[in-house]
């Protein structure tokens, strides 16, 4: 089967690698996000992980800013794909592209659709305390994550899973499912999603810890936003990379955000947050025991 692969971040690499290792299918081209300026004054262009893997395997790479133009759609048509596989590409796939391949466009989505449609499904599964999540492979249409389900499988969410570890698990699950779908595509019976059960995982832009939330909620936030959740420590950004929590009725009269002991345990709206691994801006990550050696945490400012 001739395949065009569309993907960009590290999550997409596993699926592309599975396809490249499978002799039954041929990746004729890769589409990925345009390289981003990086380094001083933006003089260095950083390619996506998918871009790098494709070049290493001598596959044609295309980085259009949009797929809406006729010229781009004609180029895809000329490649004569049997199917287009989309995994966290980052661009809208217009109807003109969806209708080109014999088998249309299929998408690997890391949630149990229709739960957690949208940009951040893995984050929201952790944030919401879901006990399981999974991968859904859908036949794409023009609506966001609303296509018919071709295959769906679930996995448990471990109490210690963060966005990094859970993403890797789902990437490998989705990759094996992709091969199964492609090998059996003529025999699959698509299942329509129930829109009444839909929930949405919008892009997350706020990574600041709010101690007016319960300690268990903050712990999930640290795992879901790893490694970006932070608080302000004496006015400087301190990333919180790993935590635990406990209940303590003796501190219930303290204000949320108060440091309650020399280990820098912090009062929350409900419960006490225990930072375990932290990272001060400009510094390397360290265990909390090493961090507090350099500070009088009982007299610090936490916000």
From Swiss-Prot:
CDD domains: FMT_core_Met-tRNA-FMT_N, Met_tRNA_FMT_C. GO terms for molecular function: methionyl-tRNA formyltransferase activity. It catalyses: L-methionyl-tRNA(fMet) + (6R)-10-formyltetrahydrofolate = N-formyl-L-methionyl-tRNA(fMet) + (6S)-5,6,7,8-tetrahydrofolate + H(+). Belongs to the Fmt family. InterPro entries: Fmt (IPR005794), Formyl_trans_C (IPR005793), Formyl_transf_N (IPR002376), Formyl_transf_N_sf (IPR036477), Formyl_transferase-like_C_sf (IPR011034), GART_AS (IPR001555), Met-tRNA-FMT_C (IPR044135), Met-tRNA-FMT_N (IPR041711). SUPFAM superfamilies: FMT C-terminal domain-like (SSF50486), Formyltransferase (SSF53328). PANTHER family: METHIONYL-TRNA FORMYLTRANSFERASE (PTHR11138), METHIONYL-TRNA FORMYLTRANSFERASE, MITOCHONDRIAL (PTHR11138:SF5). Attaches a formyl group to the free amino group of methionyl-tRNA(fMet). The formyl group appears to play a dual role in the initiator identity of N-formylmethionyl-tRNA by promoting its recognition by IF2 and preventing the misappropriation of this tRNA by the elongation apparatus. The gene is fmt. PROSITE patterns: GART (PS00373). GO terms for cellular component: cytosol. (6S)-5,6,7,8-tetrahydrofolate binds at residues 111-114. This is Methionyl-tRNA formyltransferase. Its EC number is 2.1.2.9. The lineage of its organism: Bacteria, Pseudomonadati, Pseudomonadota, Alphaproteobacteria, Rickettsiales. Keywords: Protein biosynthesis, Transferase. Gene3D superfamilies: 3.40.50.12230. It comes from Ehrlichia canis (strain Jake).
